[in-house]
Amino acid sequence: MMGCGFHFPWFFFLIIGLQAPLSLSLTSQGSALLKFRARVNSDPHGTLANWNVSGINDLCYWSGVTCVDGKVQILDLSGYSLEGTLAPELSQLSDLRSLILSRNHFSGGIPKEYGSFENLEVLDLRENDLSGQIPPELSNGLSLKHLLLSGNKFSDDMRIKIVRLQSSYEVRLKKSPKLSPLAVLGCINRKLGHCVSRNRIIQVKKVEAIVFRIKATSRRFLKAFPSFLEETDIYKRRELLEETSNLAAEPAPSAPSPSPGIITEASPRSSGSFPAVTNAKKRRPPLVPPVPSPDKGSTSPDISKNQPQDNKQSKGSKHVWLYVVIAVASFVGLLIIVAVIFFCRKRAVKSIGPWKTGLSGQLQKAFVTGVPKLNRSELETACEDFSNIIETFDGYTVYKGTLSSGVEIAVASTAIAESKEWTRAMEMAYRRKIDTLSRINHKNFVNLIGYCEEDDPFNRMMVFEYAPNGTLFEHLHDKETEHLDWSARMRIIMGTAYCLQHMHGMNPPMAHTDFNSSEIYLTDDYAAKVSEIPFNLEARLNPKKHVSGDLEQTSLLLPPEPEANVHSFGVLMLEIISGKLSFSDEYGSIEQWASKYLEKDDLGEMIDPSLKTFKEEELEVICDVIRECLKTEQRQRPSMKDVAEQLKQVINITPEKATPRSSPLWWAELEILSSEAT
């Protein structure tokens, strides 16, 4: 007994030592967050009330914290009126990708340690009381894409410092909706990509880049005119005065007087080697005295001969300058108009006239964002007072409806019934979802055909195509549904591949947020229709929600990546050819189950027993593609374009054959009207 009592403490400490590494990551992350909490002097809304030592093992449930696989990926405390200083210890969050602290009252400077983030992509410090200089260490952040600093109190030489930072990411310094030169520079360096504004991500218009280049081109063109060379002396002087890189200097003691033909204005500051001109009024050339009026009967003198020659030249140069300015301005204006028209025609959805038959009321309004806005009353009639429920999900319900033309629709309505529960962030996510879905427009996709938003009574809805034959999951695993033969399954595989290829090929690429057999619906002729979750807002909007699982598929703040869809497509093909669930308690994941057959090339053993026939050549190619799609390293996986091309070489199903043979009426009308509009 004594021996046991003697060894027990050592055994106890051994257990603790083994468990320590498991919580080390959480402890280090929690310590960094608690040090940030200690620097917050005022928390009027109690946002950080659940940030405490006792809950350090549950830090993924702390307000504003979003985790993926137990690692802090996002810290979003925007708009909580927090006061204090920024904690340099946040740089210890090595997996942090987004740090959003905008619209608070943080003071002091930006810690130089923020340049040591390894994976940080977004640093948003807008509308605080930060001051001092931007630390040059921020240039060390190789992964930083968006740096937002407007609405602070940085020193005047901030622009000089920020120029030294890398121009591979976008910088936002001003509140003005106009882009600052630095922001424009950043955008041009990124091939006119997306720049970050105060409230949203906006597309930099190509017109601005064209105007930027026209200025330099027109300047070189005008140098051919002598009058322009005379007038540019004062213009250059003013430009130099406005450059922030020219530091203030005292006026030179013996500043040369300007040429007689140029009138300069006094300026309170000077620029480097160009002294400011003071007391300009005293340096103006004397006015030409008036010519006395001639006596009656006497011949009028030739006034032009009495005027100085330089006055003639001055008037002439002014007239030439005026004509040149008008000509150049007209030319630039014409180019801007042409560029705007070209840009709008390229970026915007083609203008389509209202449907001519079968639709009434709001459905006949012109398109605004690619889809029409509908009335609740019209949808209520179509869905029989919202009594025809297809399915209820976590956060939204899907109803079936029929329009007056006979077209069947599916209406997804959020479960939130009061406007006070619908936050601003939810509204932004809702509109972003509409914008995203409205741009896909593929015949193997469950397309968005309308939306409804009203506040009295409150509702937010999306209207989709209706696929009457249920989901692929039901046909593969429910014995009561109709059996799918080998040809039907191959058509579903190809239709799905073409749809994902289209989504990944968009600009910017769009990846499916949760790709699986339950998100693939079938039409009357068993063509595949890929659907997207309309209201998946909880993970984005609930700061206490812990996000787990595959980062690429479940995180909404961090957009999904196409490589994750490629992996899911490989799992889907296994599910289609084998008829087995993607996960089962019996055999685990379908990948583990299939690995032994894929390694030994014993492919026939994987075939669904309910299939009477199958094509061995197609099966071999499918299994080759599956091996590529399921590779652990994302970079080694093929693109969906390569996947579709490889499958198409053996499976003779073109995109036209993979689409529904009987398109819904609204698709047919849309195609007719599109051809008429063009």
UniProtKB/Swiss-Prot annotation:
One of its GO terms (biological process) is root hair cell differentiation. Its main location: membrane. One of its GO terms (molecular function) is protein serine kinase activity. Disruption phenotype: Short straight root hairs. It catalyses: L-seryl-[protein] + ATP = O-phospho-L-seryl-[protein] + ADP + H(+); L-threonyl-[protein] + ATP = O-phospho-L-threonyl-[protein] + ADP + H(+). This is Protein MALE DISCOVERER 2. It is a single-pass type I membrane protein. The keyword Cytoplasm does not apply. The gene is MDIS2.
